[in-house]
Amino acid sequence: MSNLKEQVQAVVELIENGYALPGMGVHEYLEDVLEIGYQISGDKRYLGARLLVAFGGPNIWVDTRTQTVEGYWWGEKFEVYYHTDELGLHEACEELASSLFDCV
């Protein structure tokens, strides 16, 4: 489980501290995301997004609505809450959802 735990923690640190590479920001990070599922209310309010950021060993999901990073590897699961979003992931996903779905 330690490898799963380390990889999930690395994603949490990236979200809480912002992107570590110079000249790279949230939009560059989103270019590498494998899947984005938007959570939108019946009255078209953006609630959050669920992003697949790693696949195949382990699978790692970020949920901006619940502020969690979830890792799955075989039968194991490891989940961590993040407290700040210095990367700006929630806002960037909201911006994308607004342009795709006319969210309010």
Predicted regions and their residues:
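Acidic, low-complexity, intrinsically disordered interaction modules
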Residues: 46-79
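Negatively charged, low-complexity tracts enriched in Asp/Glu with abundant Ser/Thr
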Residues: 1-53
